[in-house]
Each structure stands twice: as C-alpha cells, then as structure tokens.
Amino acid sequence: MRRKTRNFKHKTVKDNKVLTEGSDQESEKDNSQCCDPATNERVQAEKRQYVCTECGKAFSQSANLTVHERIHTGEKPYKCKECGKAFSHSSNLVVHRRIHTGLKPYTCSECGKSFSGKSHLIRHQGIHSGEKTYECKECGKAFSRSSGLISHHRVHTGEKPYSCIECGKAFSRSSNLTQHQRMHRGKKVYKCKECGKTCGSNTKIMDHQRIHTGEKPYECDECGKTFILRKTLNEHQRLHRREKPYKCNECGKAFTSNRNLVDHQRVHTGEKPYKCNECGKTFRQTSQVILHLRTHTKEKPYKCSECGKAYRYSSQLIQHQRKHNEEKETS
C-alpha cells in the first residue's frame, strides 16, 4: 500500500518573494544549490512548521513548541516529590533532584570540584579562565557572569527583591531566601557537635565550626592576617585598597561592609534591636550584647600569658600587657 504524505502549506521567503511549497517555481531550482549555505538555511526554515502564537518563534517539532509555550503560560508540570518545587521542563527537574540525592556528575578538570548541572560547571570554569567581562560602574569590581554583577549591584542600591511569604523578611539573593525559609519549614538539619547550634546549610555549619577549631583558612595576601570566613577576608582587603563602597545616606560616612553600614545607621535611627535576656538592656549591635553579657556571667576570656591574670575585654588585656612591657624596659 502506498503511504500518503501530508503536504504542509507553509510559507517561506526567497529573494523577497513569497513562494508556496510544491509550486513550479520551487521545483525549478538547480540541484547544484543543495550545498549552498543560503539554500540550506531556507530548507531548515521550511522545516519550522510549528509557530508560537504569542511571540512568533517557530519550531520543527510540536514537542519543542509545547515546552516553549510554558514560558508564556507559566505552566510547570514537573514537580519534585521531595520539596514540591515545580519546573517547566523535565531536564530541569532531573538537575534539581541532584540537590536531594547529592549527585554531582560534572567535574571541573582544573580543580576537581563537582557540580550537579552542566551550566553550573561552565559558570565555575570562568574562575579558572580569569575572564571577567562584567564590571560594576559604582566600584569597578568585575564579574565573570552577568548574574554576579546584578547580585553585586544590589549592594549599592540596597534592593532586596526576594521576600519571605511567611514573615516578610527581604533578601538581596534568592539563595539567602531559600536558606531562611528552611527555618519556617523546620529544616535546620545541620547541627554543630560542639554547641548544638543548627544551620540551614552545610557550608554555614562548616563556617560556624571554625569558631571552635580556631581554623582560619582565608589569608590576606597583603599583610598575612587570617580569617574564619571568606567574606570577612573580602571586607578586610578593602582596607588595603581603601575601598568603602557602603555609604550612609544620612551623613555620608562610608564603610567596607554592608554589616558595618547597617550598624552605623542605627546611630541615626536610634534603633537598638538586640536585648539582654538577663536585665533587658538593649544595644545597637550583637557584639555589644556579647560584651555586656560578661557582666552577668563574670566570664573573663582574655588571659595574660605573662602572669595569668584574666580580663573581660580585650582592651583591658592590652592595657595590662603594656605594664609588663614598661617593666621590661625599665629593668
């Protein structure tokens, strides 16, 4: 039995003339044109028979059009059984599920670091190539990805587009919102064996544990000072560069970190959000509460290596040690 073939009546463009497939003009083309790039491009265009009614984009397969249309409809039929997050494409769900399974099949040939998705590996490889084409006009800092520049720019604008639907708290990065939302869902699964503190991510608990171990893996190339956290090193390095990108709108004073700016702004607002549970006294900064609590606990963590005398504050120890130095100089 002879198989019937459907004759699709779609239009294509050739030499600014609209031709219909199967016409005499089209059949008269020279066979030698089959290898011509322009002709091949036209043939490929003819194959794109499935057109999106929203934006006009064309596809050669109906399945590809169906997936594309989800951009306009917002449909996300592929749902993760672990956390409920939904996706418009099945491949995105496959990559997402690796978060739960821990599978990281894409490995960097330079440093051996592994990733759950190929796109994550490609972005990471920009670190090794050193290519940083996206530069911040405010402070000159450069990034290998446009997304990195967009996130960084919020440092200057103060924009926090990611809000928690539970409590309204806003964040500048979606990853910070995700970690915060785990608190509401009760998913603080990472626990410190030393003090019992829990965190929403493995990286945060690893950073925290360095408080107990004393490990400071991040070293400044300029002065050799070491730090527990990478972000603290970054803030410190701005001192060497004399870079202070965080500026107070009230008085113009500038700071090396957003945290220091927020603490400073409370001078103008009078806000004292940190309260002592023992006596009810309030403070502008968490560090002030920690120092104040020692008046209740009688803790004296700063000990003199010369005579063993202990002090509540580091400034008291420094002042005490000067006496030993003076005694050595006069003796």
Curated annotation (Swiss-Prot):
InterPro entries: Znf_C2H2_sf (IPR036236), Znf_C2H2_type (IPR013087)
Segments of skewed composition (Basic residues): 1-12
Phosphoserine: residues bearing it: S23
GO biological process, alphabetically ordered: regulation of transcription by RNA polymerase II
Zinc finger (C2H2-type): 50-72, 78-100, 106-128, 134-156, 162-184, 190-212, 218-240, 246-268, 274-296, 302-324
Keyword Zinc-finger tagged: yes
Assigned keywords, A-Z: DNA-binding, Metal-binding, Nucleus, Phosphoprotein, Repeat, Transcription, Transcription regulation, Zinc, Zinc-finger
Record-linked PROSITE patterns: ZINC_FINGER_C2H2_1, ZINC_FINGER_C2H2_2
GO MF annotation terms: DNA-binding transcription factor activity; RNA polymerase II cis-regulatory region sequence-specific DNA binding; sequence-specific double-stranded DNA binding; zinc ion binding
Recorded superkingdom: Eukaryota
Gene3D superfamilies on file: Classic Zinc Finger
Chain intervals for the UniProt region annotation (Disordered): 1-35
Cellular compartments per GO CC: nucleus
Cellular compartment(s): Nucleus
Keyword Cell inner membrane: no
A Pfam family it matches: zf-C2H2
Function per UniProt: May be involved in transcriptional regulation.
UniProt record similarity statement: Belongs to the krueppel C2H2-type zinc-finger protein family.
Official protein name in the record: Zinc finger protein 660
